[in-house]
Amino acid sequence: MPTIEERVQELADKDEIRELTARYCLAVAEGDADELVALFCPDGTFVTGDRQYSGLAGLRELYGGLAAGVPPKPFIQNHVIEVDGDTATGRCGAEIRMVRKGEAYTVAGHYADVYRRLDGRWRFLSRNFMTYHAVPLSQGWA
């Protein structure tokens, strides 16, 4: 049975990780590539479909163009986190509103994450976005 101190630490870790994912969504919505890259470990990766972006240079390539157009607006929910010392895994659902070639889109999927505590702060070691659907808003998802 975990001690009260261990239980409090687990709750604090989970809260910090939830805040990490919230900061990620805010930075995406604001097109803030510097903040997004800072949320990852130096050897961090982001995977979506068949594309993978690795390391700080790869992440900057991924996020660098967000401010050029209308940045996506991600919303996350149902966040489940398992903490194991200085690493953790998590999964959260995501709904994203975005514009592609001048047309509004709705995207749904989930993030499968691995987190690492680095210099006393939780960061993404990896984010893998799995898409359920990505369709023009005018068509709906069903």
What is each of the regions a protein language model found here?
Residues A33-I96:
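A solvent-exposed, acidic/Ser-Thr-rich amphipathic alpha-helical stretch
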Residues G140-A142:
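Extended, polar beta-sheet/loop recognition surfaces of beta-rich domains
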Residues T89, A108-S138:
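Short beta-strand edge/turn micro-motifs at domain boundaries
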Residues R23, G58-E61, H110:
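Alpha-helical elements of Rossmann-like donor-binding domains used by nucleotide-donor carbohydrate transfer enzymes
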Residues P74-I76, T106-Y111:
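Short, surface-exposed coil-to-beta transition loops
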Residues M1-E30, D34, A38-L39:
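Short, low-complexity N-terminal intrinsically disordered segments enriched in polar/charged residues
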Residues R97-A104, A134:
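Short, cysteine-centered beta-strand-loop-beta hairpins and adjacent loop/turn segments enriched
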